Amino acid sequence: MSSLTFFIFCLQLFIFTSTVSGISIKRCTEEENNTWEIEVGLCIQTENFRAIKTGCYKIQGPGGLLTEGNGFKIFAHDDCSKEKTQNNFILDSVNEAVYALGKYVYMEISTSNITTLNSLPQCAKRISLSISCDQVTTEMKSYVESVSFKDYDLEFVITTDISCVKHVSSSVIVRNECEKKYISTGKKIFGFNNKIDCSAVKFSEHVNYLKTCSVGKFDRKKYYEHQHNYIKKIFHHNEL
Protein backbone atom coordinates (compact mmCIF):
# COMPACT_ATOMS: atom_id res chain seq x y z
CA MET A 1 0.00 0.00 0.00
CA SER A 2 1.46 3.34 -1.08
CA SER A 3 1.74 6.29 1.27
CA LEU A 4 -0.96 8.15 -0.64
CA THR A 5 -3.35 5.19 -0.53
CA PHE A 6 -2.74 4.75 3.18
CA PHE A 7 -3.37 8.44 3.79
CA ILE A 8 -6.67 8.33 1.88
CA PHE A 9 -7.72 5.21 3.83
CA CYS A 10 -6.96 6.91 7.15
CA LEU A 11 -8.84 10.04 6.08
CA GLN A 12 -11.91 8.00 5.11
CA LEU A 13 -11.77 6.11 8.41
CA PHE A 14 -11.58 9.39 10.32
CA ILE A 15 -14.57 10.83 8.45
CA PHE A 16 -16.61 7.65 9.03
CA THR A 17 -15.76 7.55 12.74
CA SER A 18 -16.61 11.22 13.17
CA THR A 19 -19.94 10.75 11.40
CA VAL A 20 -20.90 7.75 13.54
CA SER A 21 -19.83 9.56 16.69
CA GLY A 22 -21.84 12.60 15.64
CA ILE A 23 -24.94 10.48 15.28
CA SER A 24 -24.49 9.00 18.75
CA ILE A 25 -23.98 12.33 20.49
CA LYS A 26 -27.17 13.37 22.25
CA ARG A 27 -27.70 17.08 21.88
CA CYS A 28 -30.24 19.34 23.56
CA THR A 29 -31.59 22.63 22.36
CA GLU A 30 -31.26 25.78 24.41
CA GLU A 31 -34.99 25.64 25.04
CA GLU A 32 -34.73 22.08 26.44
CA ASN A 33 -31.86 23.11 28.71
CA ASN A 34 -33.86 26.04 30.05
CA THR A 35 -37.30 24.44 30.43
CA TRP A 36 -37.85 22.83 33.83
CA GLU A 37 -40.36 20.59 35.56
CA ILE A 38 -40.96 19.92 39.24
CA GLU A 39 -42.90 16.92 40.49
CA VAL A 40 -43.76 16.05 44.10
CA GLY A 41 -45.17 12.56 44.72
CA LEU A 42 -46.87 11.59 47.99
CA CYS A 43 -47.87 8.03 48.83
CA ILE A 44 -50.23 8.37 51.78
CA GLN A 45 -51.25 5.33 53.83
CA THR A 46 -54.41 6.14 55.77
CA GLU A 47 -54.98 5.41 59.47
CA ASN A 48 -58.35 4.12 60.76
CA PHE A 49 -60.32 5.15 57.67
CA ARG A 50 -60.48 4.41 53.96
CA ALA A 51 -60.30 6.97 51.20
CA ILE A 52 -63.15 6.82 48.70
CA LYS A 53 -62.75 7.08 44.94
CA THR A 54 -64.96 10.14 44.73
CA GLY A 55 -62.26 12.29 43.19
CA CYS A 56 -60.37 15.25 44.53
CA TYR A 57 -60.61 19.01 44.13
CA LYS A 58 -57.87 21.58 43.54
CA ILE A 59 -58.21 25.21 44.58
CA GLN A 60 -55.47 27.54 43.33
CA GLY A 61 -54.39 30.81 44.88
CA PRO A 62 -51.59 33.24 44.02
CA GLY A 63 -49.37 31.93 46.81
CA GLY A 64 -50.18 28.23 46.64
CA LEU A 65 -52.87 25.62 46.17
CA LEU A 66 -54.91 23.21 48.25
CA THR A 67 -56.56 19.88 47.57
CA GLU A 68 -59.67 18.41 49.17
CA GLY A 69 -61.07 14.89 49.32
CA ASN A 70 -60.49 11.42 50.77
CA GLY A 71 -60.41 12.45 54.43
CA PHE A 72 -57.57 14.96 54.36
CA LYS A 73 -56.48 18.22 52.80
CA ILE A 74 -53.10 19.11 51.34
CA PHE A 75 -51.93 22.71 51.55
CA ALA A 76 -49.03 23.73 49.30
CA HIS A 77 -47.52 27.22 49.36
CA ASP A 78 -44.30 29.19 49.05
CA ASP A 79 -42.82 31.78 51.43
CA CYS A 80 -43.76 34.83 49.38
CA SER A 81 -46.13 37.54 50.48
CA LYS A 82 -48.20 39.66 48.13
CA GLU A 83 -45.74 42.52 48.58
CA LYS A 84 -42.62 40.42 47.88
CA THR A 85 -43.40 38.91 44.51
CA GLN A 86 -45.50 39.25 41.40
CA ASN A 87 -44.99 35.56 40.57
CA ASN A 88 -47.76 33.03 41.11
CA PHE A 89 -47.07 29.75 42.91
CA ILE A 90 -45.04 27.52 40.60
CA LEU A 91 -46.91 24.23 41.26
CA ASP A 92 -50.23 24.18 39.41
CA SER A 93 -51.23 20.58 38.60
CA VAL A 94 -52.67 17.93 40.95
CA ASN A 95 -53.40 14.29 40.10
CA GLU A 96 -54.59 11.48 42.36
CA ALA A 97 -54.90 7.69 42.45
CA VAL A 98 -56.60 5.58 45.15
CA TYR A 99 -55.27 2.07 45.79
CA ALA A 100 -56.03 -0.99 47.92
CA LEU A 101 -59.70 -0.15 48.55
CA GLY A 102 -58.81 3.25 49.95
CA LYS A 103 -55.92 2.29 52.21
CA TYR A 104 -53.45 4.17 50.00
CA VAL A 105 -53.69 7.45 48.12
CA TYR A 106 -51.03 8.66 45.71
CA MET A 107 -50.94 12.42 45.07
CA GLU A 108 -48.84 14.06 42.38
CA ILE A 109 -48.40 17.83 42.63
CA SER A 110 -46.36 19.24 39.80
CA THR A 111 -45.62 21.84 37.17
CA SER A 112 -43.87 21.89 33.81
CA ASN A 113 -42.61 24.36 31.25
CA ILE A 114 -40.90 26.59 33.82
CA THR A 115 -38.53 28.92 31.98
CA THR A 116 -37.72 31.23 34.90
CA LEU A 117 -36.35 28.81 37.50
CA ASN A 118 -33.06 30.65 38.01
CA SER A 119 -34.70 34.07 38.11
CA LEU A 120 -37.41 33.22 40.64
CA PRO A 121 -37.22 35.11 43.95
CA GLN A 122 -35.87 33.17 46.93
CA CYS A 123 -39.27 33.07 48.62
CA ALA A 124 -40.79 31.28 45.60
CA LYS A 125 -38.17 28.51 45.90
CA ARG A 126 -39.17 27.61 49.48
CA ILE A 127 -42.10 25.24 49.03
CA SER A 128 -44.11 23.77 51.91
CA LEU A 129 -46.68 20.97 51.66
CA SER A 130 -48.86 20.05 54.64
CA ILE A 131 -51.16 17.03 54.88
CA SER A 132 -53.96 17.78 57.37
CA CYS A 133 -56.75 15.47 58.57
CA ASP A 134 -60.41 16.45 58.06
CA GLN A 135 -61.64 14.82 61.26
CA VAL A 136 -59.06 16.43 63.57
CA THR A 137 -60.29 19.81 64.80
CA THR A 138 -57.26 20.74 66.91
CA GLU A 139 -53.56 21.25 66.20
CA MET A 140 -51.78 18.75 63.99
CA LYS A 141 -49.72 15.93 65.45
CA SER A 142 -47.09 16.29 62.81
CA TYR A 143 -44.01 14.73 61.30
CA VAL A 144 -41.75 17.04 59.28
CA GLU A 145 -39.17 16.21 56.62
CA SER A 146 -37.32 18.33 54.10
CA VAL A 147 -35.11 18.08 51.04
CA SER A 148 -32.94 20.65 49.27
CA PHE A 149 -31.64 20.99 45.73
CA LYS A 150 -28.61 23.22 46.22
CA ASP A 151 -27.85 23.47 42.50
CA TYR A 152 -31.22 25.12 41.95
CA ASP A 153 -31.51 26.71 45.41
CA LEU A 154 -34.82 24.91 45.94
CA GLU A 155 -36.14 23.59 49.26
CA PHE A 156 -39.19 21.43 49.96
CA VAL A 157 -40.71 20.84 53.41
CA ILE A 158 -43.46 18.24 53.93
CA THR A 159 -45.50 18.20 57.14
CA THR A 160 -47.75 15.20 57.79
CA ASP A 161 -50.61 15.00 60.29
CA ILE A 162 -50.08 11.56 61.82
CA SER A 163 -53.56 11.66 63.39
CA CYS A 164 -55.04 10.24 60.20
CA VAL A 165 -51.94 9.22 58.24
CA LYS A 166 -50.14 6.01 59.14
CA HIS A 167 -47.27 6.42 56.72
CA VAL A 168 -46.04 8.74 53.96
CA SER A 169 -43.38 8.14 51.33
CA SER A 170 -42.38 11.07 49.19
CA SER A 171 -40.42 11.89 46.07
CA VAL A 172 -39.29 15.18 44.61
CA ILE A 173 -38.07 15.45 41.02
CA VAL A 174 -36.46 18.59 39.61
CA ARG A 175 -35.10 18.35 36.07
CA ASN A 176 -34.99 20.12 32.74
CA GLU A 177 -36.29 18.73 29.46
CA CYS A 178 -32.80 17.62 28.42
CA GLU A 179 -32.36 15.56 31.59
CA LYS A 180 -35.82 14.11 31.15
CA LYS A 181 -34.94 12.89 27.65
CA TYR A 182 -31.54 11.35 28.32
CA ILE A 183 -30.65 10.84 31.97
CA SER A 184 -32.43 10.19 35.26
CA THR A 185 -30.73 12.93 37.26
CA GLY A 186 -32.51 15.53 39.31
CA LYS A 187 -34.48 13.04 41.38
CA LYS A 188 -34.33 13.01 45.16
CA ILE A 189 -36.36 10.52 47.15
CA PHE A 190 -37.18 10.94 50.81
CA GLY A 191 -39.66 9.55 53.30
CA PHE A 192 -39.95 7.25 56.26
CA ASN A 193 -38.41 4.36 54.33
CA ASN A 194 -37.09 6.00 51.13
CA LYS A 195 -39.68 4.08 49.14
CA ILE A 196 -41.94 5.66 46.54
CA ASP A 197 -43.90 2.63 45.42
CA CYS A 198 -47.47 2.87 46.70
CA SER A 199 -49.32 -0.24 47.84
CA ALA A 200 -48.46 -2.77 45.11
CA VAL A 201 -48.05 -0.10 42.43
CA LYS A 202 -44.52 0.77 41.36
CA PHE A 203 -43.49 4.39 40.98
CA SER A 204 -43.18 4.10 37.21
CA GLU A 205 -46.76 2.75 36.97
CA HIS A 206 -48.61 5.59 38.74
CA VAL A 207 -49.10 7.40 35.45
CA ASN A 208 -51.49 4.60 34.40
CA TYR A 209 -53.86 5.29 37.31
CA LEU A 210 -53.64 9.02 38.01
CA LYS A 211 -56.70 11.21 37.47
CA THR A 212 -56.67 14.98 37.38
CA CYS A 213 -58.28 16.70 40.36
CA SER A 214 -61.27 18.85 39.46
CA VAL A 215 -61.26 22.59 40.06
CA GLY A 216 -62.99 23.37 43.36
CA LYS A 217 -64.35 26.49 45.04
CA PHE A 218 -62.93 27.86 48.27
CA ASP A 219 -65.28 27.90 51.28
CA ARG A 220 -63.59 29.14 54.44
CA LYS A 221 -66.21 27.38 56.63
CA LYS A 222 -64.64 24.02 55.71
CA TYR A 223 -61.37 24.84 57.44
CA TYR A 224 -60.39 24.66 61.10
CA GLU A 225 -58.58 27.42 62.93
CA HIS A 226 -55.25 25.59 62.91
CA GLN A 227 -55.46 25.46 59.10
CA HIS A 228 -55.98 29.20 58.68
CA ASN A 229 -52.27 30.02 58.45
CA TYR A 230 -52.02 27.83 55.35
CA ILE A 231 -55.03 29.59 53.82
CA LYS A 232 -53.46 32.99 54.45
CA LYS A 233 -50.29 31.89 52.65
CA ILE A 234 -52.16 30.42 49.69
CA PHE A 235 -54.51 33.36 49.11
CA HIS A 236 -52.29 36.15 50.50
CA HIS A 237 -54.89 37.04 53.12
CA ASN A 238 -53.83 38.94 56.23
CA GLU A 239 -56.66 37.41 58.24
CA LEU A 240 -59.68 35.13 57.87
Swiss-Prot record:
It comes from Sheeppox virus (strain InS-1) (SPPV). Belongs to the poxviruses B9 family. This is T4 protein. It comes from the Viruses. InterPro entries: Apoptosis_reg_M-T4 (IPR016399), M-T4_sf (IPR038687), Poxvirus_T4p_C (IPR007579), Poxvirus_T4p_N (IPR007580).
